[in-house]
C-alpha cells in the first residue's frame, strides 16, 4: 500500500498525469499526508503542476487541507506566484482567509513575496485585509516592509 502512496506523491510532484489518473481510477485515498503534512494537492500546487492539481480537485481533494505548519495549497501558490492554480483553488472553494501557525494568510504571502498578480486575485475574490499575523502585522504592513509599491497601492484602495 505504501508504494501506491509514494506513487501518488510522485505523480503529484512531477505532473505524471497517466500515473495520477491510474491511481485516481483505483480510488486511492487522495487526502493522505506525508511526514510534513503535505497532501498530494499541496505538493502538486507548490510544484506548479496545474494539470495534476486540476485532476486532484476534480477527484474532490481537500482544497483547505493544511500541512503540519498550517500551510494550505493556496498559501503555497501565493508564495510561488501560480495565478492559474490559485484561480482553480478558489473556484473549488479554497478559504482565502485561513491562517497558518504564525497567523499568515495567502494574501500576506503574496504581499510579502511580491506576487502582485496573486494579491490582485485574492483581493478580487474578497480576501480579508484586516487579518493580523502573530506579530500583529497585516498584508499591508508586510507589503510596506518589503517596499512592494504595487501591493501597497492595491491594499490601500480598500
Located regions from the model:
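Ankyrin-repeat-protein effector appendages
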Residues: 1-10, 14, 92, 125-128, ...
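Conserved ankyrin/ankyrin-like repeat signature
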Residues: 19, 51-52, 84-85, 117-118, ...
Amino acid at each position: 500500500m505504501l508504494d501506491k502512496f509514494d506513487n501518488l506523491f510522485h505523480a503529484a510532484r512531477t505532473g505524471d498525469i497517466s500515473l495520477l489518473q491510474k491511481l485516481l481510477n483505483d480510488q486511492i485515498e487522495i487526502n493522505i499526508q506525508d511526514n510534513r503534512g503535505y497532501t498530494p494537492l499541496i505538493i502538486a500546487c507548490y510544484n506548479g503542476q496545474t494539470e495534476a492539481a486540476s485532476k486532484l480537485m476534480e477527484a474532490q481533494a481537500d482544497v483547505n487541507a493544511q500541512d503540519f505548519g498550517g500551510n494550505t495549497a493556496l498559501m503555497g501558490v501565493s508564495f510561488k506566484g501560480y495565478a492559474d492554480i490559485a484561480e482553480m483553488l478558489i473556484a473549488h472553494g479554497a478559504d482565502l482567509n485561513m491562517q497558518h501557525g504564525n497567523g499568515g494568510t495567502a494574501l500576506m504571502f503574496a504581499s510579502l513575496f511580491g506576487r502582485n498578480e496573486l494579491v490582485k486575485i485574492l483581493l478580487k475574490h474578497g480576501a480579508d485585509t484586516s487579518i493580523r499575523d502573530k506579530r500583529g502585522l497585516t498584508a499591508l504592513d508586510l507589503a510596506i516592509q518589503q517596499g512592494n509599491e504595487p501591493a501597497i497601492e492595491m491594499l490601500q484602495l480598500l
